C-alpha cells in the first residue's frame, strides 16, 4: 500500500477509498439523486456535473462516489453480475498504463507476505470464514481458475472458484480434480496433487449443503463465501487494492515466461519462428487459465514480456528458469524471482521496447 500511496502522491492526485465518507447514489434508474453520508441531498451544480460526467452505469448498485474530483478512485459500485467495479481518475489510469511495470511488480513484492498470511489462516482450528477463504485462495494459487459469481451461475449456469459445488470435485488420496462449466460455457477440468489441500477441501465438502466453500459462523450456521468476500480477503492479505485477477495475471505471465524458456531450447532465430513460439506459448497459458489465446494475450500476459522475447532481450532471464515442471515451492519461487528481476529491469529502463508496439499492446490490455 505504501508504494501505491507514493505513486498517487507523485501523480498529483489524492487517495480515496469507499470505506471513507463519500457521495451515495439513491433512487432508481431515470430518477436518481445523490446524498452525503449524513443523508443530505447533493444540490451543488458543479458536483452534479462531475457526477454526470462520470457516466456511472444505471444498473450499478451500492454506488459510492469520491467527494473530491482529485481523488484517484472516483467511483465504486456493484454491477448486474454481482461484481465490484471501480472507476479511476483519467490521470491515474493514464499513469498506470504508462508505468508498465507498476502493478505486476508491486504484486510480486507483496506475494510472499500474502502466502505467509494464507498459510497462517490455514492452520486455524475451526472452519470459520477466514480459514475457508484461505483454503479457497490456496486452490486459486494451484489452479488460477476464475473466482466466479452467483449471478453468472444463476444467469448462465457457469461456475468459478467461489461458486463450485461438491459435485464438481473428486478427491482420491492426494489427487484433487475440479470439473465444471466455466465462463462462456468453456469446460474446465483441472487436476493437481496436494495431500494437505485435498484434506482441507474434503473437510469443506463435509459441511451440509451443495456449495463447496462454506464456513461456520460463531452461531454454528453454515454460509457460503462469495467473490466479494474473497476479493476483500485478498486486499487484506496484500495490504493493497489487488484482486483475484491480479493472481491470474501474475500466474499467466509467469507461465508465459516458463513456456518461452521451454520453447527457447529450440533457439528460434527468425521473426516468423519467434511469432510461432509466441502462439504456442499463449496456447499453453490459455489452457492453464481456461481462456482463449486472444484473451490471454490481451489481459493475462504482460505484453512487454513477449516483445522482449521477440527483441532478444529475454535470453538471460529464460536461462534461469526451471524448464522442468515446478512441483516444489522452491522451484516456483525461483521462477518468480526471475520474473521480478525482469520487471525491475523494465522499471529501470534496462529493457528497451519499441514505443509504438508497447502502446498498442497496453491499449489492448486496458480495454
Residue ranges and their predicted role:
Residues 1-159, 163-250, 254-278, 282-289, ...:
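A positively charged, amphipathic N-terminal helix/segment that binds anionic biomolecules
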Residues 262, 271-367:
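Acidic, low-complexity interaction regions
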Amino acid at each position: 500500500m505504501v508504494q501505491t500511496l507514493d505513486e498517487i502522491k507523485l501523480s498529483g492526485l489524492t487517495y480515496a477509498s469507499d470505506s471513507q465518507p463519500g457521495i451515495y447514489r439513491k433512487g432508481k434508474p431515470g430518477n436518481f439523486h445523490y446524498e452525503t453520508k449524513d443523508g443530505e441531498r447533493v444540490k451543488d451544480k458543479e458536483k452534479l456535473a462531475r457526477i454526470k460526467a462520470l457516466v456511472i452505469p444505471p444498473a450499478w448498485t451500492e454506488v459510492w462516489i469520491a467527494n473530491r474530483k482529485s481523488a484517484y478512485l472516483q467511483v465504486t459500485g456493484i454491477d448486474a453480475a454481482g461484481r465490484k467495479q471501480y472507476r479511476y481518475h483519467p490521470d491515474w489510469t493514464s499513469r498506470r498504463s504508462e508505468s508498465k511495470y507498476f502493478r505486476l511488480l508491486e504484486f510480486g513484492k507483496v506475494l510472499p507476505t500474502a502466502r505467509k498470511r494464507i498459510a497462517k489462516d490455514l492452520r486455524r482450528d475451526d472452519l470459520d470464514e477466514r480459514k475457508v477463504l484461505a483454503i479457497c485462495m490456496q486452490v486459486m494459487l494451484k489452479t488460477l481458475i476464475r473466482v466466479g459469481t452467483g449471478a453468472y451461475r444463476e444467469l448462465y449456469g457457469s461456475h468459478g472458484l467461489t461458486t463450485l459445488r461438491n459435485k464438481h470435485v473428486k478427491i482420491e488420496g492426494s489427487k484433487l480434480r475440479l470439473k465444471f462449466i466455466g465462463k462462456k460455457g468453456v469446460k474446465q477440468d483441472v487436476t493437481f496433487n496436494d495431500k494437505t489441500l485435498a484434506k482441507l477441501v474434503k473437510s469443506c465438502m463435509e459441511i451440509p449443503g451443495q456449495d463447496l466453500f462454506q464456513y461456520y459462523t460463531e452461531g454454528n450456521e453454515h454460509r457460503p463465501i462469495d467473490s466479494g468476500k474473497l476479493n476483500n480477503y485478498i486486499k487484506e492479505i496484500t495490504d493493497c487494492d489487488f484482486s483475484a485477477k491480479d493472481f491470474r495475471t501474475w500466474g499467466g505471465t509467469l507461465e508465459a515466461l516458463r513456456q518461452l524458456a521451454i520453447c527457447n531450447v529450440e533457439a528460434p532465430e527468425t521473426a516468423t519462428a519467434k511469432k510461432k513460439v509466441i502462439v504456442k506459448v499463449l496456447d499453453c497459458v490459455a489452457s492453464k487459465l481456461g481462456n482463449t489465446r486472444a484473451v490471454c494475450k490481451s489481459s493475462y500476459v504482460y505484453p512487454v514480456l513477449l516483445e522482449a522475447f521477440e527483441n532478444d532481450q529475454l535470453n538471460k532471464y529464460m536461462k534461469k528458469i526451471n524448464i522442468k515442471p515446478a512441483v516444489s515451492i522452491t522451484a516456483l519461487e525461483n521462477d518468480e524471482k526471475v520474473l521480478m528481476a525482469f520487471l525491475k529491469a523494465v522499471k529501470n529502463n534496462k529493457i528497451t521496447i519499441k514505443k509504438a508496439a508497447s502502446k498498442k499492446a497496453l491499449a489492448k490490455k486496458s480495454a
